[in-house]
Amino acid sequence: MADCAGPSSAGRKAGAPRRSRKAAGTKQTSTLKQEDASKRKAELEAAVRKKIEFERKALHIVEQLLEENITEEFLMECGKFITPAHYSDVVDERSIVKLCGYPLCQKKLGIVPKQKYKISTKTNKVYDITERKSFCSNFCYQASKFFEAQIPKTPVWVREEERHPDFQLLKEQQSGHSGEEVQLCSKAIKTSDIDNPSHFEKQYESSSSSTHSDSSSDNEQDFVSSILPGNRPNSTSIRPQLHQKSIMKKKAGHKANSKHKDKEQTVIDVTEQLGDCKLDSQEKDATCELPLQKVNTQSSSNSTLPERLKASENSESEYSRSEITLVGISKKSAEHFKRKFAKSNQVSRSVSSSVQVCPEVGKRNLLKILKETLIEWKTEETLRFLYGQNYASVCLKPEASLVKEELDEDDIISDPDSHFPAWRESQNSLDESLPFRGSGTAIKPLPSYENLKKETEKLNLRIREFYRGRYVLDEETTKSQDSEEHDSTFPLIDSSSQNQIRKRIVLEKLSKVLPGLLVPLQITLGDIYTQLKNLVRTFRLTNRNIIHKPAEWTLIAMVLLSLLTPILGIQKHSQEGMVFTRFLDTLLEELHLKNEDLESLTIVFRTSCLPE
């Protein structure tokens, strides 16, 4: 027992120093961890204080750059301790206080434009002037952007270990831009873009939906080879390829179905005849037309090889005209450029169709509209104003040859025994020639004899009852009631009259055109305005015959001016009249008209009738 107790007590004595050493190591480790944590905390606090200090210094520099007297050395020194965001704040703050955004400029901002874009007629470009509004000139804007591009973008508190950049300022001799250029459209496709389509796609074209949907074509090469300008090779060079394809298709046809033997033999014959075609002469159409017709008549809609041959022939003729050799294109790139060229072809076709307008048709329509307008305007008072107060027209109407109308039953019915004055006949003749004459003047149908007989009997009965004292008249009471119900209304004044408004519109349109026509006559608009106003007062104006285009108003002014020249005392063979005639001839040539066209419009107001 004693022997057993001895070793156990010795083991307990040996374990006590081991536990004490372990406790001492744990205490020492915790002390080191606390020291590291406090050290890291101190370093973090120092870094935060350093960051705050640099930010405070940068903000102080921003405040200093808001002053007016800034030197170049101070500006380049400040660029080492600020970021582009700080410099942008400087530009904004200076523009708010109406100073130029460039710190070296001491000028004040004038009137700031409100628009966002500016069109430069010098460079034919559109610029975004949002940032340009903060500067007094294009040079200050360019110099400011030049300096801002040199400012480092790294944080200001980590620049101690970096090398400071050498700032440079823009010289005053160099010109600036009006703002940031706006790209209105993509650039045209060049040969270099075709050779390197990936670069072209990144710059000018967004990814299409077909590219994202087709995952199998992602690894496909866009172009097997390039498109090179030059002469096309003869069709004999592609004949072996077509012949080889036809043989391959022939073998596949024998394996699949024996019904295509005749068709394949026809394709081989066509391929051999295609080799004799020459692209640089007109024999191609005559040589290749019959084989193609033979293929089209014998091949069905399911056969693909003849269709490919026809498509290849069409592509050959197109490329022969453009003198471009197509070595090879993948399906993806072919679809891409097919969409591109289709859009350009649509634009060119729309422009060409809009340009191809027959001038003769437009000329006839213009003269027709003006004749109808002048005929509607003309009244009996117009002819009296032009040819005198004692003017009276007789049966002859010169405008009857100009306006051809079909007579209806209302126009045929007339009273040959009527003895109206001459001016009443001319008034009726003018009214009949108007195209907008309504059906209100038509003769009403005669009432039936039975109705007239009944009305006569009723009238006789009323008369008998009235004389017997049994009939009471209700007319006076009804009239008094009507007068009480309806309030009295005043007639329209001249300013509110529709006719006066139309005359004012016509005079306003003519006043814009006549000053240019009066230059050869050496008179002003005020000299003829009274006569023109009196002439317009005699017109019959509606809401439709006063709406015309500027070219039509020019011709109307020429017609009216030629009518007023005798009244103004200007003779046709005088010097002013001859100059005016030559001027009208030149103006008519610019409008693609002749002197006869103007005469056909003027003759509407002239007649072969004699004065009374």
Swiss-Prot record:
Compartment(s) of residence: Cytoplasm; Nucleus
Function of the protein: Protein phosphatase that displays CTD phosphatase activity and regulates transcription of snRNA genes. Recognizes and binds phosphorylated 'Ser-7' of the C-terminal heptapeptide repeat domain (CTD) of the largest RNA polymerase II subunit POLR2A, and mediates dephosphorylation of 'Ser-5' of the CTD, thereby promoting transcription of snRNA genes. Downstream of EIF2AK3/PERK, dephosphorylates ERN1, a sensor for the endoplasmic reticulum unfolded protein response (UPR), to abort failed ER-stress adaptation and trigger apoptosis.
Gene: RPAP2
EC number: 3.1.3.16
Keyword Mitochondrion applies: no
Main enzyme class: hydrolase
Organism expressing this protein natively: Pongo abelii
UniProt-recorded name of the protein: Putative RNA polymerase II subunit B1 CTD phosphatase RPAP2
UniProt similarity note: Belongs to the RPAP2 family.
GO CC terms, sorted: cytoplasm; nucleus; transcription preinitiation complex
